[in-house]
Amino acid sequence: MTDWLTYEWEFRGERATFRVDMQYWELLPVLSYSQLIYVCAAPKDSLAKEFNKVEQYRFRMLRHRLIDELEGRAIHVGSVYTDTLRTLYFYAAEAEVIQQASAICRDFGTLAITCAHASEPHFTTYYRFLYPDDARLQSVENAVYIEAMRKKGSDLEMIRRVTLTLSFLTVEDRSAFLKDVPKLGFTPGGTSWQGESTHPACCTVSGFTSLSLPKLNKFTARAISAAAPLEGMLTDIDAEFVRRY
């Protein structure tokens, strides 16, 4: 049984696709798989801007072999893909599994491959890098929102006003957030009280951005990061509609 989540975020200055098996959030601490194994693959040509078709095929074969042949000795927990680098992450009980992984990698000389391992008793790569925080989780919702706007005929590249609704446990927390909003590049909006909600103290803030996914992700991440220390959360996005002609 798996529970894969895919989201887009930035990695080393590039747009990246992250995949993480969410089931291991609870399972990793009770397993004895504390040896991280990671396999990085890139085009042989260091100046290449992307994987060519042959390299894409060879990487798929590499991925399938690693997952199939390491089964029972290692668990595949996630991956990060950019145009020029693809990395697979595993956890194993024994560091010796790296030898088996390295042997598999040697069969794929058409790719530039690095195969390495590290002891991670606290599963840092999974919890701090692969598993999404609130800002990264929001990127999934952002992608859905952007697609809905695209289907309606909106010009996604045009900058427009975007209004965010954030919710807090108390009026005091909301006030503290709104006090610092201008420093974040947002304009404070209205406030409301939703008594039936677990976070009843609500407010809106607005700013300007396009609806490209990287831009909207950075926009919402600023608000989420500022609200998080006050136990606030982003609950709604409302972007002005700009028609595509």
Regions found by a protein language model. Give the residues of each.
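Long, contiguous binding/interaction regions
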Residues: 1-245
